[in-house]
Amino acid sequence: MTQGAVKTTGKRSRAVSAKKKAILSAALDTFSQFGFHGTRLEQIAELAGVSKTNLLYYFPSKEALYIAVLRQILDIWLAPLKAFREDFAPLAAIKEYIRLKLEVSRDYPQASRLFCMEMLAGAPLLMDELTGDLKALIDEKSALIAGWVKSGKLAPIDPQHLIFMIWASTQHYADFAPQVEAVTGATLRDEVFFNQTVENVQRIIIEGIRPR
């Protein structure tokens, strides 16, 4: 392959990547506002600046696009948990995980709300992911946390309930943002409130799992 051909291929690859990114971003905005059934592909295509035909070239159906968006959300959420290793200092690792989850709630509130909508609907289009890769990851990290408990590095808690509690307390600030703002007058976009939230959620959870 000539140098010119390589450059052309590289440009084409970047263009495809940028177009997919624009479609996924537009899909997240639209699905989180109207839900799966209330969204039309024409809306997403218009927001992404592509034709419907072009959209369907990359994502063959509305369902395929919706699942791609949800998988992208899961990848963002689960990356910090995937990084957990047995040699980590447990309290420091969990404390940092809480911060990262709150950063996700701050930076991707629409993603959190869309995922919540899917769960409330019974996860009809995401159940394979939940019972497959997600469950496998939670089983793996629960065993790791159980090892920390057994070695006395954490208080005697159930690992799955700890993970659920972290998810619930951090995602609340995205899923129920209007309620949080109505009560406190602030959102996670407010730097002072964000730091207060991180410190309080960390303290409440960490003090509950600190070995006595």
Curated annotation (Swiss-Prot):
Question: What GO biological process terms does the UniProt entry carry, in alphabetical order?
Answer: negative regulation of DNA-templated transcription; positive regulation of DNA-templated transcription; regulation of DNA-templated transcription
Q: What domain of life?
A: Bacteria
Checking PROSITE patterns in the record gives: HTH_TETR_2 (PS50977)
Residue ranges forming the DNA-binding region read 39-58
Which molecular function GO terms apply here? DNA-binding transcription factor activity; transcription cis-regulatory region binding
Which positions fall inside the HTH tetR-type domain? 17-77
For this protein, the record's InterPro entries field holds: Homeodomain-like_sf, HTH-type_TetR-like_transc_reg, HTH_TetR, Tet_transcr_reg_TetR-rel_C_sf, Tscrpt_reg_pyr_util_RutR, Tscrpt_reg_YcdC_C
Instruction: Fetch the Gene3D superfamilies from UniProt.
Output: Homeodomain-like, Tetracycline Repressor, domain 2
Q: Which UniProt keywords apply?
A: DNA-binding, Repressor, Transcription, Transcription regulation
NCBIfam families tied to this protein: PRK15008.1, RutR
Self-association state and partner proteins as the record states? Homodimer.
PANTHER family under this entry?
Answer: HTH-TYPE TRANSCRIPTIONAL REGULATOR RUTR
Instruction: Supply any other comment.
Output: The Rut pathway degrades exogenous pyrimidines as the sole nitrogen source at room temperature but not at 37 degrees Celsius, a restriction that is apparently a consequence of an inadequate ability to remove toxic malonic semialdehyde at the higher temperature (RutE/YdfG function).
Q: What does this protein do?
A: Master transcription regulator which represses the degradation of pyrimidines (rutABCDEFG) and purines (gcl operon) for maintenance of metabolic balance between pyrimidines and purines. It also regulates the synthesis of pyrimidine nucleotides and arginine from glutamine (carAB) and the supply of glutamate (gadABWX).
- Protein name, per record: HTH-type transcriptional regulator RutR
The organism encoding this protein is Escherichia coli (strain K12)
What gene makes this protein? rutR
